[in-house]
């Protein structure tokens, strides 16, 4: 599968080092990390300047990890690490 940012939520399943095509301000409601393989798998999301805006670590029960309500705009968005075959869902306002 490939990244799909055509709807809401955005579905990110591939990290290729290139930023997502939204380098301007993005209004994020919340994010979810799901479908990872083992406890301790990691998902890291940064802004366009490389500042970490969310770090998710896989839980022992393999349930999805939720960010809680962001409710703010971030300057660009990039998923720099996505372990264990997981997916990142980004809900946009």
Give the ranges of each region predicted by the language model.
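Exposed aromatic-hydrophobic patches
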Residues: 22, 62-72
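Beta-rich globular "head" domains
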Residues: 13-47
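Short secondary-structure capping/turn segments at boundaries of alpha-helices and beta-strands
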Residues: 18-19, 66, 76-77
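Solvent-exposed serine/threonine-rich low-complexity stretches and specific carbohydrate-binding patches
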Residues: 10, 52-61
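C-terminal interaction-tip segments
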Residues: 1-26, 83-93
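Short, surface-exposed beta-strand/strand-loop-strand elements in extracellular ectodomains
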Residues: 37-56, 88-92
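Noncatalytic modules at the cell exterior or secretory-pathway interfaces
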Residues: 29-31, 70-85
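Intrinsically disordered, low-complexity regions of eukaryotic proteins
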Residues: 6, 15, 34, 49, ...
């Amino acid at each position: 599968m490939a990244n799909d940012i055509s709807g809401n939520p955005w579905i990110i399943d591939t990290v290729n080092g290139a930023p997502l095509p939204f380098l301007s301000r993005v209004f994020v409601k919340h994010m979810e990390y799901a479908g990872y393989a083992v406890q301790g798998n990691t998902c890291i999301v940064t802004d366009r300047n490389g500042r970490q805006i969310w770090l998710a670590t896989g839980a022992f029960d393999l349930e999805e990890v939720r960010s809680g309500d962001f409710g703010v705009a971030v300057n660009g968005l990039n998923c720099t690490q996505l372990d264990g075959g997981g997916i990142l869902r980004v809900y946009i306002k």
